Amino acid sequence: VYDEPNCFDSFMAHYGKFTNVSNYIAIVGAKNDQEKAGYYGEKLVLGCQELGLNTCWVAMSHGKTKAVIGKGQKLLIVIALGYGENQGVAHKSKDISEISRADVETDWFTKGMEAVCLAPTAVNQQKFMFELKDEMVTAKAPRGICTKIDLGIAKYHFEAGSGHKIFTK
């Protein structure tokens, strides 16, 4: 959505410390598409960053959007888009040992998890677990606010950092 400042002109947006934001990506889909929203949304985010734009995942600190939402769909998440006053601040990350398990240590799994630690999350949490077992990587997240979106973001980072796909059961 281009040139629409009202989305970030609410109390919650000021709580999120947004100023002069008038462009955003509204990710709309079925309720059960949250993980896909995170995965493909992060692919968009990194592409925008490569173009010199700043982005921010916004789960709850925005107002009403002008996104077109079809029947059976909902607004899953918003990504603020524009030129920031700075390049942002590094977020605190959990240690790799807190968000992963491996039956054998491999260089590619470690690289993937290092990329996961750099991944943003929609509500600044890392409530997911990656596991390497029998040469197969799985990842899961508990129920909670935006945990499936965060899992999708983290999965994209893992695959980009490790060069390996995550398998789902």
Where are the regions a protein language model picked out?
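Acidic, surface-exposed loops and disordered segments
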Residues: 1-169
